[in-house]
Regions:
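Beta1/beta-strand and adjacent pyrophosphate-binding region of the FAD-binding site
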Residues: 2-14, 162-170
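Residues at the starts of beta-strands that form the adenosine-phosphate
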Residues: 5, 28, 163, 185-188, ...
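Short hydrophobic core segments
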Residues: 7-9, 120-133, 165-167, 245-254
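Beta1-alpha1 glycine-rich phosphate/pyrophosphate-binding loop at the start
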Residues: 11-89, 174-203, 271-272
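A Rossmann-like FAD-binding core segment of flavoenzymes
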Residues: 88, 92-113, 120-123, 182-273
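Rossmann-like dinucleotide-binding core of oxidoreductases
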Residues: 126-149, 158-219, 319-327
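FAD-site-proximal beta/loop scaffold in flavoenzymes
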Residues: 144-158, 255-304
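A conserved FAD-binding loop/helix module that cradles the flavin
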Residues: 294-327
Length: 327
């Protein structure tokens, strides 16, 4: 069995930052991810532009460059690959962590790779940095599991000349609706609220509002989907029930951390907020020796922690681990 000082679950920016900080303190670390490096960013829309500036996405003291004021998805992917190479981080991609057994200083992490081969690793400490983008919020309506219903939006081309419903009114939904419209889809936006979210990026919000006002994108507000069929959707609006011809549905109503994995790992969650119990100084959980990093610290309040502030969790955790493990 391969042994490490620390096994890190999750190879997003926060997980990479943890690996860097541990390596700089002379600690061995293995990073395991069920997807690719920065898997969540890879699954962002192809043309996404970050809301923040490059220096706020940096980890390990490595500068991030961008051709524009704000970096895009492609630039971020390239940057994090470069950082992983520079620090020679030990990363296992496409490997699912199944269980974390044992206790502080003597953990056994069991996993399965994409070929179905099982692995075991010994670790003195464990860090969970699993993010929140893997589990989409569900509509809980009949037909949601049809192949035409998608919870992630990548790019618009496949939906040219199709009838597409976009559910939601935050950044993901607004961007998807606009790109789909620009590419020739017939777009309908459905949202339970009164209007487009005030948190939508300033260069997107007026654009989507103008398309709605002009009728170029059809909008149903204070409305919700009640049923999805192969060729239509049924929704309830303030004017009553409507049935729309439909080819594809993008249910972009948010995401949440993999709470089931946390509970299975023995992490205590607050019943009201689903926040894991952690030490605010060290980010160690109530399960001794297991630390939490990144957005999962916030429970259901995923708008509290982003790459910009979660990237500092690595130093916070690594400092405590190094002090406890000693020389």
């Amino acid at each position: 069995m391969n042994s490490f000082d620390v096994v890190i679950v999750g190879a997003g920016p926060t997980g990479l930052a943890c690996g860097i900080e541990l390596k700089q303190r002379g600690r061995s670390a293995l990073i395991i991810d069920k997807g690719c490096v920065v898997n969540s960013i890879y699954h962002y829309p192809t043309n996404l532009v970050f809301f923040t500036t490059p220096e706020l996405l940096e980890i390990g003291g490595i500068p991030m460059t961008s051709l524009n004021e704000k970096p895009n998805r492609h630039e971020a992917l390239k940057y994090y690959r470069r950082v992983a190479d520079y620090f020679k981080l030990n990363i296992h991609q496409y490997e699912q962590v199944d269980s974390i057994e044992g206790s502080d200083l003597n953990f056994t992490v069991r996993s399965t790779d994409r070929d179905g081969v099982h692995h075991e690793y010994s670790a003195r400490k464990v860090i969970l940095a699993t993010g929140y983008y893997d589990v989409p919020n569900r509509l809980n309506v009949p037909g949601e599991d049809l192949p035409k219903v998608l919870h992630y939006y990548k790019e618009p081309h496949p939906y040219y000349n199709q009838d597409v419903v976009v559910i939601g009114a935050k950044n993901s939904a607004a961007l998807a609706a606009l790109e789909l419209y620009w590419t020739g889809a017939r777009v309908t936006l459905v949202h339970r609220g009164e209007h487009i979210s005030s948190k939508v990026k300033y260069w997107i919000k007026p654009n989507i509002e103008n398309r709605l006002k002009a009728g170029e994108i059809t909008g149903y507000f204070r409305s919700h989907i009640t049923e999805i069929s192969p060729n239509s959707v049924r929704l309830v609006t303030p004017e009553g029930e409507k049935v729309l011809t439909n080819d594809f549905v993008f249910a972009l109503v948010g995401y949440r951390p993999d709470l089931e994995f946390l509970e299975r790992t023995g992490i205590s969650l607050d019943p009201a907020t689903l926040r894991p119990q952690t030490d605010k100084h060290t980010l160690e959980s109530a399960r001794n020796g297991v630390y939490l990093a990144g957005v999962i610290v916030a429970g259901m309040h995923t708008n509290e922690i982003f790459i910009e502030n979660g990237r500092f969790h690595g130093a916070q955790i690594a400092q405590d681990i190094a002090a406890r493990l000693g020389s």
